[in-house]
Amino acid sequence: MDVNGRVAVITGGASGIGRGMARAFAGAGMRLVLADLDEAMLAATVDELGEAGTEVIGQRCDVSRLEDVEALAAAAVERFGAVHVLCNNAGVGIPTPTHNIRLEDWKWMIDVDLWGPIYGVKTFLPIMEEQGEGHINTTASVAGLIGGGFMGAYNVAKHGAVGLMTTLERDLRGRKSPVHASVLCPGPINTDISRHSVGYRPSRRSPKANSAAEGRAGANVQAALDNGMDPDEVGRLVLDGVLTDRFWLFTHGWTVKLLTRQLDALAADGSLSKG
């Protein structure tokens, strides 16, 4: 897809991977609609890109609410007349072992990380098909392919997001749709997703570790993020995926190696991993 002058909608666009996407798309000449719940950060990112010459607007949006996603689409079409790229990027996640996750946290993470992309596809796909072109990308995770420990609800939601996008792409190709799909499965990226997520939890407080092992696991997750890939690099990867209509977008080369080990274990003895 030629993206110069086209319109991209990015949820979770105020910071992290979403802001990296926005910067990459702006550099390619796209017009942008950024959505986020953090209105102060959203305004700062819109100002940054606008001052650099990008046509950009911001909209507060809770992707777990269908009416918010529909309002986002309406705002994009009203301002720019079309939507060519949708990035379902908004997400939340807090390290907690499966047996300790509160039911309200299960619902919260699945509402944002899975229902958010579902609402995005349901709302934006008809717009793109009517205009005759488009690309829908969803930010899943390596956790959507290989379920590690201490991230139960997040892993479940991200597995669902991968399933959504693989099925969508097959459906689109099966009926020769002009719209393409892709899924981003990042490894550790230098974002504040865990710290930011706490402020949006239903209980508005951090989960407490019930053991020293849980405390270390949570600290290890945050340390991996703090030392992770630059989100701007991820944004450039997604832009390239849109330009080339590539489905699988991996940030780290070891992703395929981990998948291969998992499949080898399955074939060998039905276990989760070998070695």
List each model region and its residues.
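Substrate-binding pocket helix/loop in short-chain dehydrogenase/reductase
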Residues: P97-T98, R102-K107
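Residue(s) in the substrate-gating loop at a strand-loop-helix junction
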Residues: S141
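Canonical Rossmann dinucleotide-binding motif of NAD(H)/NADP(H)-dependent dehydrogenases/reductases
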Residues: D2-V33
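The beta1-alpha1 cofactor-binding region of Rossmann-like NAD(H)/NADP(H)-dependent oxidoreductases
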Residues: E39-A40, R60-A71, L103
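Active-site helix of classical SDR
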Residues: V121, A157
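Conserved glycine-rich Rossmann-like NAD(P)H-binding loop of the short-chain dehydrogenase/reductase
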Residues: A28-T45
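SDR active-site lid
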Residues: R173-L249
